[in-house]
């Protein structure tokens, strides 16, 4: 079976510089120009320069565990690093009431399999709009039925 790195090939942004603030989120963030769904094969180009302090984003989690490659779409209006740290805590604490915590607490999964990237910078500060964009990407990437975005 192919690895997630093969399935979700990305081009790394060469001019990206981590925030240099001893950020605990940056090691988990993949900085890319494109994201590819491991289920549908759809490729999305990233629409704006982004980093861990970017707000109003749709983001994409990939499980890098060989043979798994499941993905999750989420949104945040806060700084991206704040949301990343929450996901990391869910995983490290085995919080199975949260989708990412549940997935990464499965047998042979752990925090080293967690990768996250910004999928889209939403250009308007409208809660209803960002929620709709999140739903569109969940449908587009089939993350509800064949991904980590499952209802508990």
Model-derived regions: residue spans:
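Charged structural interfaces that engage phosphate-rich ligands
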Residues: 1-152
